[in-house]
Amino acid sequence: MDYTQILVKPLVSEKATFVKEQAQQVVFFVNPRANKIEIKKAVEAAFKVKVTDVNVITKKPSDKVRQGRVVGRISGCKKAYVTLAPGEKIEFFEGV
């Protein structure tokens, strides 16, 4: 897979911002079929940085229940917490 197919979009949230400042990690939504090695290579190719570690979280799809009835479906996703090498940063995330 090409790195444009692996990295879906960056995750910008309160937790992602906290992790970026404290642990020098950035968070991406990634393709559910991508593995850690492919994610590492994709981030290094796309942003020209050195990656030291990748942690992956997979959220399963679930039903949305309201008043005892199934109203809809919440889609699942896969998130990657990418740890950058000391001194590295992605300019895309600065100022967010």
UniProtKB/Swiss-Prot annotation:
Subunit structure: Part of the 50S ribosomal subunit. Contacts protein L29, and trigger factor when it is bound to the ribosome.
GO CC annotation: ribonucleoprotein complex; ribosome
Keywords, in A-Z order: Ribonucleoprotein, Ribosomal protein, RNA-binding, rRNA-binding
Lineage, highest ranks first: Bacteria, Pseudomonadati, Thermodesulfobacteriota, Desulfovibrionia, Desulfovibrionales
Protein name: Large ribosomal subunit protein uL23
PROSITE patterns from the UniProt entry: RIBOSOMAL_L23 (PS00050)
UniProt xrefs under SUPFAM superfamilies: Ribosomal proteins S24e, L23 and L15e
PANTHER family (alphabetical): 60S RIBOSOMAL PROTEIN L23A
Family: Belongs to the universal ribosomal protein uL23 family.
Transmembrane regions listed in the UniProt entry: none
